[in-house]
Amino acid sequence: LTDFQKKINRFDSFTKVRSAVLGQVNWSLVDLIEDKDKRDYTQAFLEDLDETYNHALKILNDFDVVVDRPKPLPYDPNKKYVLPNFELSAIKNCVSPADSFLCIANTVVEVSSVQETSFLDFVQYRHIWQEYFDNGSSWIAPPIPTHDPAQWDGFDYYDWAEPLLDGPSVDPVGNIALIPEGVVLNKRAKLWLERQFPQFDFVTVKGTRGHLDSYFRILKPGLIYSAIPKEQFPDKFKNWDIIFTDKTQYTPPEIVSLFIQDDDYENTTLDVNGFSLDEENFILMRHMWEHHPEVVKQIESHGINCIPLPFDSSRFLNQGITCIINATNRDGKLEDYF
């Protein structure tokens, strides 16, 4: 693919992927952790994650996917990032490029995340999006968030606060874009998206309050791999087939640093968080073969080849495969799949 020009093109999560951004470990962030034992086991988890990246990069290369990587900004204990309503001791680990950036249509959106720790994440990816922009892609952002504490004084007010959204809170499926009921995408964020992308019909998935990629994955038109029942999906999906998996019950690990971990365990089912290379190949966490082989067989019964990815650090980090790989270009177009 030497003649491939990097441009944003994303209307789904299942057609052939041509380019993507793969995360990178910022090793310096372990120095944020004062307790030696916690620092040591966090280091071990990050080493495991680095191996996961190596495996993921090989898979992507095998499928001729053009890959970019962020440039981690080293932690400096003598530096603080002071904003009017909060201050940061570091910049978030750039392990999950999908969290801070939404690729939709021909545009990359630098999102206004609900997490303060993500405020300066864009610095580590600027070289990537500049190249896409120079090649003709659009590059935008919602209003810069203030994270004024008053906005958290009661949930209703937060819901109508400044536009706040995370990248995985939007899942395009042709000419519609699925969104959650709230928390990681509030009402003003929905209005902002509708005005920026009028070609999409933004449709809410009932009972979802977190990143959609940890509730379900659309494997191909007519087929969903899901941890939520079919009745929660919009009526448009009533004739689609569902491969259902129960949410795995486990005790969430201790949060040692929000610059390294995601703490939304309540709204996350990592089992479903896989990545489609195309409609016939799906990357899935390796532990699924050990603990849920029947689910793997169900997916494969639909003509989809499942590719195992070792990801033992996923629970500690609360990150899945679609968190660490952000597809920037797929073959899909603005289609009506319904």
Regions found by a protein language model. Name each.
Residues 1-338:
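The feature marks the mature, well-folded catalytic cores of soluble enzymes
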